[in-house]
């Protein structure tokens, strides 16, 4: 454990844990296949027991510690995949040595590597001084740089940033983005500060991170999160580039989610919400899953509810609305609105921008009940963690829960949803659109050229030459007396004839990433007979990928 005895406190890995064999719970895991209980194990086969890869509490409480909650989900996935990891080790070790090696690496993966806790003073506009608290957690450096957002909230704590950093590690692994996980938080309510004060806080926080080596294009790359956006990321990039990164040509790659003029990328603002849409799309169009839920594939006749009308909630609502689904309820911290005939996202966005709240929207009524218990097809919790608990899970009426937020479902609620045959599309897959497009922006900053710029004209000329070649061939074969046979491109081809723009590339790359990851989760769920337990399937995929990196790289310098 390392400790800075000043304004900053740096905590390294948790205390040493035995790396030998892990204990096992007596309860076996319940398998599901197409919504039905799994068949009894064959003679001689023992169902995988729940194993714990640290001293963290299992998912026994309705309101668990957030970081331990994530660790409990990790345990579920690790207990499923451990035997396969042992089987896949191609070494001369004995079976016992292989198993000890696997369990040791799983114990290495699980803790949060570093947590930086710091405080610093700022002078407010009225002349008074205030001490600001902030944190940055780095869960894993199996891939570098680390990646994770910065949030401004009075609820920020060490536990929260550790949990969110660990989720980022698994999230990046699920969608094959080569980053380790990190997360930062500043313990303030941004509504209580002027723009000038927020700029001071953001720039000073950046300098504190830089002094401790917690920010840099190849070290740790923050991004927007709750109550932060392009403006704050621009301040961070400018602060780093003007100081520590003054001589670094890649300095602006120290943060993503920037404005376009500061090295940002088209499509980043809507990326998380668009990713939520694509994630739902991949499962709602899968007939086998819809038959389990008693639903028809597609968005056409579906209703949905959004909890949280921020960046993620707004853009998720936009895309689902565009593809035919109907939003009947939207909720925020100050209240909810309801209209069984549907709520238009653009009209609601305009109203909120003008009035600062969704309450009073003329085309919807105030909803007094719990938004999480509204009768709908799809529920999108896009607010904060631990919203769906043991107490309200039995009353949830949605058939699909799409986790736009991080950690909205507690382990006990997750069990209830499995028992009730409700599909939960997990956070570590569904809201990975943001980090996916952040990866594209980071690469763009390192390449110092926007996507498509080098190929626009070549692709356009090539397409026109292709059309001319087809036209000339047809005229030689079928033309009479030198008559012409004009080739007219369709509207869709005309839109693409000049090649892909940066926005096109970002959108297609995100859609492909979400589709590929969804297929991997489906295959894993089928392979391990998990049925609707998509969360465990996603964790299994993440653990396999992170384990492979540690095992092949070696753990001497971990």
UniProtKB/Swiss-Prot annotation:
Instruction: Report the protein name in the record.
Output: Glutamate dehydrogenase 1, mitochondrial
N6-succinyllysine occurs at: 68, 84, 110, 162, 183, 191, 200, 346, 352, 363, 365, 390, 415, 457, 477, 480, 503, 527, 545
Q: Where does NAD(+) bind?
A: 141-143, 176, 252, 444
According to the record's subunit comment, the protein's assembly and interactions are: Homohexamer. Interacts with HADH; this interaction inhibits the activation of GLUD1.
Q: Which residues carry this modification: ADP-ribosylcysteine?
A: 172
Q: Which UniProt keywords apply?
A: Acetylation, ADP-ribosylation, ATP-binding, Endoplasmic reticulum, GTP-binding, Hydroxylation, Mitochondrion, NADP, Nucleotide-binding, Oxidoreductase, Phosphoprotein, Transit peptide
Define the transit peptide region by residue numbers: 1-57
Which GO cellular component does the record give, naming just one? endoplasmic reticulum
The protein's enzyme class = oxidoreductase
Residues annotated as binding ADP are 450, 516
What does the entry's PTM section describe? ADP-ribosylated by SIRT4, leading to inactivate glutamate dehydrogenase activity. Stoichiometry shows that ADP-ribosylation occurs in one subunit per catalytically active homohexamer.
Residues with the Phosphoserine modification: 79, 128, 227, 384
Record-level Gene Ontology MF annotations: ATP binding; glutamate dehydrogenase (NAD+) activity; glutamate dehydrogenase (NADP+) activity; glutamate dehydrogenase [NAD(P)+] activity; GTP binding; identical protein binding
Its family remark reads:
Belongs to the Glu/Leu/Phe/Val dehydrogenases family.
List residues, modification Phosphothreonine: 410
Described function? Mitochondrial glutamate dehydrogenase that converts L-glutamate into alpha-ketoglutarate. Plays a key role in glutamine anaplerosis by producing alpha-ketoglutarate, an important intermediate in the tricarboxylic acid cycle. Plays a role in insulin homeostasis. May be involved in learning and memory reactions by increasing the turnover of the excitatory neurotransmitter glutamate.
Sites where the protein binds substrate: 147, 171, 438
Which organism is the protein's source?
Bos taurus
Catalytic residues as annotated in Swiss-Prot or TrEMBL:
183
Residues involved in GTP binding: 266, 270, 319, 322
Which residues are annotated as modified residue N6-(2-hydroxyisobutyryl)lysine in the UniProt record? 147
Point out residues bearing the modification N6-malonyllysine.
Answer: 457, 503, 527
Q: Show which residues constitute the signal peptide.
A: none
List, alphabetically, the SUPFAM superfamilies matched.
Aminoacid dehydrogenase-like, N-terminal domain, NAD(P)-binding Rossmann-fold domains
Pfam families documented for this protein: ELFV_dehydrog (PF00208), ELFV_dehydrog_N (PF02812)
């Amino acid at each position: 454990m390392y400790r800075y005895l000043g304004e900053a406190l740096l905590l390294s890995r948790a205390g040493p844990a035995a790396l030998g064999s892990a204990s096992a719970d007596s309860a076996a895991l319940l398998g599901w296949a197409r919504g039905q209980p799994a068949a009894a194990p064959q003679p001689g086969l023992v169902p995988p027991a729940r194993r714990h890869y640290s001293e963290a509490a299992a998912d026994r409480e309705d309101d668990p510690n957030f970081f331990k909650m994530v660790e409990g989900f990790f345990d579920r996935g690790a207990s499923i995949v451990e035997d396969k990891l042992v089987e896949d080790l191609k070494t001369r070790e004995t079976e016992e040595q292989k198993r000890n090696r696997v369990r040791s690496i799983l114990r290495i993966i699980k803790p949060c590597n570093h947590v930086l806790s710091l405080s610093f003073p700022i002078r407010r506009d009225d002349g008074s001084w205030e001490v600001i608290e902030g944190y940055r957690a780095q869960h894993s450096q199996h891939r570098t740089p680390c990646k994770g957002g910065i949030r401004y909230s009075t609820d920020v704590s060490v536990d929260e940033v550790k949990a969110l950093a660990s989720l980022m590690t698994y999230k990046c692994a699920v969608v094959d983005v080569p980053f380790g996980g990190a997360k930062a938080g500043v313990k303030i309510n941004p509504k209580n500060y002027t723009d000038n004060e927020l700029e001071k806080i953001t720039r000073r926080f950046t300098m504190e991170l830089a002094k401790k080596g917690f920010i840099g294009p190849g070290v740790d790359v923050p991004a927007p999160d709750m109550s932060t956006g392009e403006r704050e990321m621009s301040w961070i990039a400018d602060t780093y580039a003007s100081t520590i990164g003054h001589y670094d040509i890649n300095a602006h790659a120290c943060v993503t989610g920037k404005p376009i003029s500061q090295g940002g990328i088209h499509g980043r603002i809507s990326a998380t919400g668009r990713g939520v849409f694509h994630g739902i799309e991949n499962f709602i169009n899968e007939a086998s899953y819809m038959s389990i839920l008693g639903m028809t594939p597609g968005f056409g006749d579906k209703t949905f509810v959004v909890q949280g009308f921020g960046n993620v909630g707004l853009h998720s609502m936009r895309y689902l609305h565009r593809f035919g689904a109907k939003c009947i309820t939207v909720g925020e911290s100050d209240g909810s609105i309801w209209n069984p005939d549907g709520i238009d996202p653009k009209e609601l966005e305009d109203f909120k921008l003008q009035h600062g709240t969704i309450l009073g929207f003329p085309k919807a009524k105030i909803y007094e009940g719990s938004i999480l218990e509204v009768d709908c097809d799809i529920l999108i919790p896009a607010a904060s963690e631990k919203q769906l608990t043991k107490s309200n899970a039995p009353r949830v009426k949605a058939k699909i829960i799409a986790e736009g937020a991080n950690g909205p479902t507690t382990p006990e609620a997750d069990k209830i949803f499995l028992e009730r045959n409700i599909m939960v599309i997990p956070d570590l897959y569904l809201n990975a659109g943001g980090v996916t497009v952040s990866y594209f922006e980071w690469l763009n900053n390192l390449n110092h050229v926007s996507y498509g710029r080098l190929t626009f004209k070549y692709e356009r000329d090539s397409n026109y030459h292709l059309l001319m070649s087809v036209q000339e061939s047809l005229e030689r074969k079928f033309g009479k007396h030198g008559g012409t046979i004009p080739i007219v491109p369709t509207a869709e081809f005309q839109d693409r004839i000049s090649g892909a723009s940066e926005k096109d590339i970002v959108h297609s790359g995100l859609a492909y990433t979400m589709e590929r990851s969804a297929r991997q989760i489906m295959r894993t769920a089928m392979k391990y007979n998990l049925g609707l337990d998509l969360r465990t399937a996603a964790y299994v995929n993440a653990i396999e990928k992170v384990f492979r990196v540690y095992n092949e790289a070696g753990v001497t310098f971990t």
